[in-house]
Amino acid sequence: MTTILNEKTDRTVKNIHLMVTPLCDRKCPNCCNNLYTLNEIPYATEDELKQCERLFLTGGEPFRYTAVDDLAEYYKKRYPNIKQVIVYGNAYDCERYIMKGGTFNYIDGLSLSIKSKKDKECMESMVRDYEFEGLKHNRLYVFDNLMPTGVEIPNFAIYNRAWQSLDEYKPADDSIFRKMC
């Protein structure tokens, strides 16, 4: 497999996408995680984390398989240079996380995806029942025209997305991808 991971530079180390779990129950077409093997992804080093300013918790599915707020608290307290922690996940598992008492005390933003009707329904429910006011850096990626209806979606920048072929996929050029030790 050819790696597409960005090189560590003074610029890219400021934004670390940290795979906190490889586990996911979905089989999304053209999932970017199919572009590399787990062994290709380097572990985040102490030096990298000491230079990081924005940490993106990703997976797999972080809301399903990790305690994301506990992870955010750990990284922010251990590395005071980390100013923002943003969690990537799907709307269904985010709603389940909230319903189980999950909190966002140390999380600064969400990057949620709607990739199924179940995700769409969960996002509609979440914005009716939960206020995302404390989360300032939120994005909602909507696939397959599954835009939530009948609700306002405040505090989220909304992006309509199409599935990219794996040949077209490019990681953000201002970040590095690492896995958690």
Give, region by region, the residue ranges found by the protein language model.
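Conserved strand-turn element in the central/C-terminal portion of the radical SAM core barrel
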Residues: 112, 117, 131-171
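Extended hydrophobic/Leu-rich segments
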Residues: 49, 123-126, 135, 166-169, ...
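Canonical Radical SAM [4Fe-4S] cluster-binding loop centered on the CxxxCxxC motif
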Residues: 4-43
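Distinct, well-ordered alpha-helical segments
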Residues: 68-72, 94-103
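Core AdoMet radical
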Residues: 32-40, 52-65, 81-96, 106-141
